[in-house]
Amino acid sequence: MSETVPAASAGAVPAVMEKPLTKKRGKKPAGLTSASRKAPNLSVSKLITEALSVSQERVGMSLAALKKALAAAGYDVEKNNSRIKLSLKSLVNKGILVQTRGTGASGSFKLSKKVLPKSTRRKANKSASAKTKKLVLSRDSKSPKTAKTNKRAKKPRATAPKKAVRSGRKAKGAKGKQQQKSPVKARATKPKLTQHHKANIRKATSRK
């Protein structure tokens, strides 16, 4: 006799379908840009010149600061420490770099004026010209104030003699008026002779 397989009941739970396994992509390292990923392929000398062209330090960039800039660009500084020093020496010998401080690979470095691009030269010239203009403007702004103070000090000196001249004129005019008035007063004070006095004077003269 053949055995019959019991049919699956309608209420039975269906088997859970397994999801296909997907490969997880590795996360990109944080802080690295496209330029920094390509940095290991570039030569050390190019990276050094680029870092020095960006720096705005007049004295130059120290070796420690250079290493920090190279590490930020994605270059392995610890493994290639000797290569960095050799490239610095060769760049100094070629005249591309100028060593401002220290001796050998240790010290401060900056690009020579011949290697600097035109854009950086123009920026440096503009900054220098702007500083000189500010100094000239500050000097010009200070000079008018001193001139005004001198003018204010000179004004009372000019007005003082005018007052003295006017007072002298008034005094002279007053003296002249007094001299003119005084003889008039003297004439007025003389006693007038009456007819009686005149007759007495005539009698006195006839008796003599």
UniProtKB/Swiss-Prot annotation:
PROSITE patterns from the UniProt entry: H15 (PS51504)
Disulphide linkage map: none
The positions annotated as site (Important for nucleosome binding properties) read: Q56
Q: What is the protein name given in its UniProt record?
A: Histone H1t
Mind telling me how this protein is modified after translation?
Phosphorylated in early spermatids.
Q: Which gene encodes it?
A: H1-6
Q: Can you name the source organism? A: Macaca mulatta (Rhesus macaque)
**Family note:** Belongs to the histone H1/H5 family.
- Residues covered by region (Disordered): 1-40, 102-208
Q: Which residues carry this modification: Phosphothreonine?
A: T159
